[in-house]
Amino acid sequence: MPVIKCDSIYKIFGHNAQKIFQSTDGAIDTDALQQAGCVVGVNNASFEVHKGDLLVVMGLSGSGKSTLLRCISRLTEATAGKIYIDGEDLLALSEKKLIELRRNKMGMVFQSFALLPHKTVLENIAFPLQVKGASTQDSINRAMEMVLLVGLNGRENNFPR
């Protein structure tokens, strides 16, 4: 079972985007959308991510990468499509369940992220777990697992440059 499954995700920005999209039967007519003042942010994205996979979303500036990720986290609502996290229909979750899922199963690293310069690599990785209430030892142990997973062993005591 995939950890993340996206099936035919569309995001169209603009007035009456949902209504205009439904009238196209999924066949995006860019001219009609432009005439209606709409912009396509994500056009029929479908993929699966399985445990242990690494997925890279690449594209030019403005091509919809961040919009797709915002749809997956439901920070932006998709115009159409289905999104599943661990088999759970993300679009059917209550606000409370969505908050719980965001806290425990997903996170975003922003393009202009900042490391805490007074903390080591290991401490920077452990910090969010401590904020969530994990003990120092548990968070350090989990952070060390991540250090090993991404090949930073031997650098865990370094400070950011």
Region locations from a protein language model:
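Interfacial catalytic loop of ABC nucleotide-binding domains
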Residues: 93-96, 141, 157-159
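Conserved ABC ATPase "signature" region
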Residues: 23-31, 88-89, 130-133, 137-155
